[in-house]
Amino acid sequence: FEFVIDLEPGTEPVCKRPYKLRPEELEELKKQLDEQERMGLIRLSSSPWGCGVLFVNNKDGTERLYIDYRPLNKKTIKNKYPLPNINELFDQLKGAKVFSKLDLCMGYHQMRILEQDIPKTAFRTSCGSYEYTVMSFGLVNAPPMFSRIMNFIFNPYTNDFDRVYLDDILVFPKNKEDHAKHLRLVLDKLREHQFYAEFSKCEFWLHEV
């Protein structure tokens, strides 16, 4: 699977000046850029595109690098694939006796971007220009695209014992006896399509969610 960024006809590259960051943010920026480059998520860029960067707070108090892709998103042809309905999901859980919850490791980052579209993801910082080689948070079509891929992968089990909400997977058989078997089927599907769960964030054999 590859992520594609289709633009409106006649779109010209947009390049913004780097946003001003506080000294402590600059230090965190260098740290996160080094880490993401080491992991192969980003690379140096000479693209004519360039969006600004800022930081958002995570629930655990840490800061996450966030690319302000609004100029790119404005020119992107929108993917209309529907996102999961959380209320519908909870309705489906009625009668389930046991649950397991799988959290994909850096979910969006597990999907590569089509090579010719990588330059469109470029962002500018005081440390230089970079571009993503994998799907990034902030891209307007990332949620619907990821949802479509997950639904394609798990379609045989959806509405039976498995539901996916973006990068979270819930396994919920109606009886405990089938749970281990169903969990193995879901894990086998992840392995088949080379998606990986983050074990430390997964929870197994829960009695409520």
Question: Language-model features: where?
Answer:
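Retroelement reverse transcriptase polymerase core
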Residues: 1-209
